[in-house]
C-alpha cells in the first residue's frame, strides 16, 4: 500500500489570477482534479492535499472527495517544507509515500503504478520519475549510472558542458520509503538563492535512489502560466480524441472539436467540425453531431442528428432531428422520432414521441404528448412576473402559427388551435379553439386628416 501527497499550496503568480493555480480548469476538471483522478486507480491507503494560498477555495472545490485529508502549509517555503508538514500525521507509518505536484495534470495512472512497482521491487529509499526531452535547457539534469541509480541532480545553471548534453530531467514526482525520508526531512537546509527547503535535497541525502523514465515526456508537463495551460489542454484533447477515433468514432476535422474526458461515445458516432462535448454527456450509435454544436451533461439517443444546436442537461430520444439553431436546456426530455427545428427553444419541456416543433417556438415548463405538431411562432407564456407556470398539451394536438398558450393552461388530446390564437383557458379533447378577434375589413377606407 502507498500514501499519496499532492502539493497544492503554491500561488502561481505567473497565472496572473486570484484563483489558486491548481484550481484552474482544464477540460472538465481542475489541474489538481486531474492529478487526484489518476491517483484513484492506485487505491492509496490515504490521500493528503497540502494547501496554502487559497486553501479554503481548494478545500471547497474538492469537498466532493471525502477521502482527502488537507494539511496546511502556512508559509510556502519550498517542496521539502511542504512534505515536512506530514511528519505529525505519519509518525508510525512504515510504508511508502508518493509525492505529486498539483499542477502536473497529464500523468497517467499506469505511469504512477509503474513507478511504485519499481520502487518497491528494488527496495529503494526513493525512486524518482524522469523524462528524456529533446530540449532540456532550463531544467535540472538527472545523472545516473548504467543501472539507473541516481548519482546527482544538478541545476541547469550548474551543469558542465558535458552534463548539459544529458537530456534526462527531473519530473518532480517521487516515491519514498517513508521512514527513511522522515529521518532526513528535519535536517533540510535553506541555504540557496530562494531560501527554500527543497525536496531534491532530501533525495540527494538518501540511498539507494533509482530513476524511472516516463514513456511520453508530455505526461510530465507542468502548468505555470496560461500558455502552458493551453499547451496541456491540447495534449489532453489529442489523447482523448485519438482514443475515441480508435474506438470507432469519426471526427471530421479533429482540431476544431473538443471532447471532455467524462463524455461517452458509442461506435459509429460522427462528430462534425466546431462541435464541443462536455460533462456527463453520452451519445448513441449512429448519431451525427454538428457542425457547430455544444452538448453538455446530456444523453443523446441513437441515430440523432443535431446541427448548430446547444443542448444542456437534457435527454434526446432515438431518430430525432435537432436544429439548426435549436436550444434545449434545463432537464428537457425529447422522446423518439421528434423534430426540434430552427430557432426553437425548450426549457424544462417534455415531448412525447413523433412530436414536432419545427420553427420559431418557445416551449417552457411544458409537457407535450405524442404526435403533437407545434406551428411556427407558437410560444408558452409561462411566467407571470413572479413565478413560472406549466402548460400541458395532449397527444395529437396541433397549434396554428403564431399561437400563444398562457400558462397555467391544459389542452386536451386532438385539439386544434387556430392560427393567431391567445389561449388563456383549458380546452377539452377533440375541440377547435379560436381565441382571436374576428377580422374586420372596411373597403374604401380613408383615414381622417
UniProtKB/Swiss-Prot annotation:
Stored InterPro entries: Bifunctional_GlmU, GlmU-like, GlmU_C_LbH, Hexapep, MobA-like_NTP_Trfase, Nucleotide-diphossugar_trans, Trimer_LpxA-like_sf
Enzyme Commission number: 2.7.7.23, 2.3.1.157
Location in or out of the cell: Cytoplasm
Binding site for UDP-N-acetyl-alpha-D-glucosamine: 7-10, 21, 73, 78-79, 140, 155, 170, 224, 329, 347, 362, 373
GO molecular function, one term: UDP-N-acetylglucosamine diphosphorylase activity
Cofactor, free-text remark: Binds 1 Mg(2+) ion per subunit.
Residues engaged in binding acetyl-CoA: 376, 382-383, 419, 436
GO cellular component, one term: carboxysome
Annotated Mg(2+) binding sites: 103, 224
Gene Ontology process terms (BP): cell morphogenesis; cell wall organization; lipid A biosynthetic process; peptidoglycan biosynthetic process; regulation of cell shape; UDP-N-acetylglucosamine biosynthetic process
Enzyme class of the recorded protein, top EC level: transferase
Cofactor entry: Mg(2+)
Active site: 359
Residue segments, region N-acetyltransferase: 248-449
Family: In the N-terminal section; belongs to the N-acetylglucosamine-1-phosphate uridyltransferase family.
Functional description taken from the UniProt entry: Catalyzes the last two sequential reactions in the de novo biosynthetic pathway for UDP-N-acetylglucosamine (UDP-GlcNAc). The C-terminal domain catalyzes the transfer of acetyl group from acetyl coenzyme A to glucosamine-1-phosphate (GlcN-1-P) to produce N-acetylglucosamine-1-phosphate (GlcNAc-1-P), which is converted into UDP-GlcNAc by the transfer of uridine 5-monophosphate (from uridine 5-triphosphate), a reaction catalyzed by the N-terminal domain.
HAMAP family for this protein: GlmU
Name of this protein: Bifunctional protein GlmU
Amino acid at each position: 500500500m502507498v500514501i499519496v501527497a499532492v502539493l497544492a499550496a503554491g500561488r502561481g503568480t505567473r497565472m496572473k489570477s486570484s484563483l489558486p493555480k491548481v484550481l484552474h480548469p482544464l477540460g472538465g476538471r481542475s489541474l489538481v482534479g486531474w492529478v487526484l483522478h489518476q491517483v484513484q486507480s492506485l487505491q492509496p491507503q490515504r490521500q493528503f492535499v497540502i494547501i496554502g494560498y487559497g486553501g479554503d477555495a481548494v478545500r471547497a472545490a474538492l469537498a466532493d472527495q471525502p477521502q482527502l485529508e488537507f494539511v496546511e502549509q502556512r508559509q510556502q517555503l519550498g517542496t521539502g517544507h511542504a512534505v515536512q508538514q506530514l511528519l505529525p500525521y505519519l509518525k508510525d507509518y512504515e510504508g511508502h509515500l508518493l509525492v505529486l505536484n498539483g499542477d502536473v495534470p497529464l500523468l497517467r495512472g499506469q505511469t504512477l503504478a509503474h513507478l511504485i512497482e519499481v520502487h518497491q521491487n528494488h527496495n529503494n529509499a526513493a525512486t524518482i520519475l524522469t523524462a528524456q526531452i529533446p530540449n532540456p535547457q532550463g531544467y535540472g539534469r538527472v545523472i545516473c549510472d548504467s543501472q539507473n541509480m541516481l548519482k546527482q541532480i544538478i541545476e541547469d545553471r550548474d551543469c558542465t558542458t558535458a552534463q548539459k548534453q544529458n537530456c534526462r530531467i527531473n519530473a518532480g514526482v517521487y516515491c519514498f520509503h517513508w521512514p527513511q525520508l522522515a529521518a532526513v526531512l528535519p535536517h533540510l537546509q535553506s541555504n540557496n538563492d530562494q531560501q527554500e527547503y527543497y525536496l531534491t535535497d532530501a533525495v540527494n541525502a538518501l540511498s539507494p535512489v533509482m530513476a524511472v523514465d516516463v514513456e511520453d515526456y508530455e505526461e510530465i508537463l507542468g502548468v505555470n502560466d496560461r500558455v502552458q495551460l493551453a499547451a496541456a489542454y491540447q495534449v489532453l484533447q489529442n489523447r482523448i480524441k485519438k482514443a475515441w477515433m480508435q474506438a470507432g468514432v469519426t471526427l471530421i476535422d479533429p482540431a476544431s472539436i473538443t471532447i471532455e474526458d467524462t463524455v461517452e461515445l458509442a461506435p459509429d458516432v460522427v462528430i462534425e467540425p466546431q462541435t464541443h462535448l462536455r460533462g456527463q454527456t453520452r451519445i448513441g450509435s449512429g448519431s451525427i453531431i454538428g457542425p457547430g454544436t455544444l452538448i453538455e451533461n446530456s444523453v443523446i439517443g441513437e441515430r440523432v442528428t443535431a446541427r448548430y444546436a446547444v443542448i444542456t442537461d437534457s435527454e434526446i430520444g432515438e431518430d430525432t432531428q435537432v436544429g439548426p439553431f435549436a436550444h434545449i436546456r434545463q432537464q428537457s426530455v425529447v422522446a423518439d422520432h421528434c423534430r426540434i427545428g430552427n430557432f426553437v427553444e425548450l426549457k424544462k419541456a417534455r415531448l412525447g414521441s413523433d412530436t414536432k416543433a419545427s420553427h420559431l417556438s418557445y416551449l417552457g415548463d411544458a409537457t407535450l404528448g405524442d404526435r403533437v405538431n407545434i406551428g411556427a411562432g407558437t410560444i408558452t407564456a409561462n411566467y407571470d412576473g413572479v413565478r413560472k407556470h406549466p402548460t400541458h398539451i395532449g397527444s395529437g394536438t396541433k397549434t396554428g402559427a403564431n399561437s400563444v398558450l398562457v400558462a397555467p393552461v391544459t389542452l386536451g388530446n386532438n385539439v386544434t388551435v387556430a392560427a393567431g390564437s391567445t389561449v388563456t383557458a383549458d380546452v377539452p379533447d377533440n375541440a377547435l379553439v379560436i381565441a382571436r378577434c374576428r377580422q374586420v375589413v372596411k373597403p374604401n377606407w380613408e383615414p381622417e386628416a
